[in-house]
């Protein structure tokens, strides 16, 4: 009898143990499910907070447009100060966000950068050739580059794009690039003396100095559209303040040697000097385009970015940055900067501007323990500032 009771007790204990184990598993699963639900809720709220930051940027840029000074963009503008470069916390009840607005024209546009400019960036010769091959329609690869033949031979084959980049992440698909090579400083690149490093001598990451969308309006400081040097008459140029003999020489050069492809070549016409070059730079362009892609804003670019321009020595770039506390309203004002003479202007004028129409809004939304980082590309057009695209970003700090 005792043995039977003992056996029953053992069975009961086994059943109880199984029930306790089952309840523990159920409780654990419930905790995991509840935690997952909380995380999903926080993810949604963090993204909404980040999107609120983008809307705040749109409102700020609308004020910038309404002020009517869009031909000039500076680091002293309200849009540039907003968010204190990501240091200020904006609270939305239980959630928050930090934000920074960056001038797209303060960075190097990898869709328009020339080979000479790329050679002054932290890139290997293989990366330069491969980048140019990826974005160009030509089917023949450069010496260290790659086209379809290379990409089709990979374990997971694909074709070369043969057109412009749509995101910086796309660089990872290009021969010679990895995620580390794009988003972290490179250590295996040989640099010339022209390269300016960071404040502590560090080599910049490609993503820190690059952009895929940048453009600026093609108007003078007075807001008037620039004349097309390839179609304007000498009289029209004279009406814009260009000396008659220079206007005549420009037309003669155009008629005998063909149209101008660079404004820098206009500055090389016989008779042009530092005094009369100002009227040319501020009033003429090589086409009738109202906007130009890829130019660098002298009012917002860093010394490092400016130094990537062929013809721009580091000391001149440093002098330009030193002038940024007083806005450059027109490119002709650069001639007053020490070291920036006519020769430098001839080499760089086609790649410089004083304003921008593209802004990058970097926002980190926070809800509980969850962060969501977004980057929005905003474009100013005839209707005002608009969102071109929004991307999820890997950064946790601005």
Language-model segments: residues:
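Compositionally biased linear targeting/interaction segments
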Residues: 2-398
């Amino acid at each position: 009898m005792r043995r039977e009771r003992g056996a029953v007790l053992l069975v009961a204990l086994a059943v109880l143990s199984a029930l306790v184990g089952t309840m523990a598993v159920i409780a654990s699963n419930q905790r995991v499910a509840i935690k997952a639900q909380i995380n999903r809720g926080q993810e949604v709220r963090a993204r909404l907070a980040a999107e609120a930051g983008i809307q705040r940027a749109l409102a700020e840029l609308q004020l910038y447009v309404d002020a009517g000074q869009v031909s000039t963009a500076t680091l002293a503008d309200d849009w540039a100060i907003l968010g204190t470069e990501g240091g200020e916390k904006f609270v939305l009840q239980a959630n928050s966000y930090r934000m920074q607005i960056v001038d797209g024209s303060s960075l190097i546009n990898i869709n328009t950068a020339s080979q000479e400019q790329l050679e002054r960036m932290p890139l290997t010769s293989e990366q330069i050739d491969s980048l140019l091959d990826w974005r160009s329609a030509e089917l023949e690869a450069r010496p260290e580059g790659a086209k379809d033949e290379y990409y089709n031979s990979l374990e997971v084959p694909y074709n070369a794009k043969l057109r412009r980049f749509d995101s910086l992440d796309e660089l990872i698909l290009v021969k010679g690039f990895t995620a580390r090579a794009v988003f972290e400083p490179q250590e295996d690149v040989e640099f010339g003396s022209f390269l300016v490093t960071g404040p502590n001598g560090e080599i910049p990451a490609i993503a820190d100095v690059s952009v895929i969308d940048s453009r600026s309006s093609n108007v003078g400081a007075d807001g008037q559209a620039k004349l097309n040097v390839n179609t304007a008459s000498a009289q029209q140029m004279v009406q814009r303040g260009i000396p008659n003999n220079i206007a005549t020489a420009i037309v003669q050069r155009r008629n005998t040697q063909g149209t101008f492809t660079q404004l820098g070549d206009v500055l090389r016409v016989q008779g042009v000097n530092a005094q009369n070059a100002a009227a040319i730079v501020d009033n003429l362009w090589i086409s009738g385009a109202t906007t130009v892609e890829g130019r660098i804003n002298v009012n917002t670019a860093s010394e490092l970015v400016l130094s990537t321009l062929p013809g721009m020595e580091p000391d001149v770039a440093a002098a330009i940055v030193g002038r940024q506390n007083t806005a450059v309203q027109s490119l002709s004002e650069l001639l007053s900067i020490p070291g920036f003479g006519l020769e430098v202007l001839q080499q760089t004028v086609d790649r410089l501007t004083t304003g921008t129409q593209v802004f990058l809004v970097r926002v980190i939304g926070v809800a509980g323990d969850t962060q969501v980082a977004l980057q929005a590309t905003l474009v100013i057009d005839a209707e005002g500032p608009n969102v071109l695209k929004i991307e999820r970003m890997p950064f946790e700090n601005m």
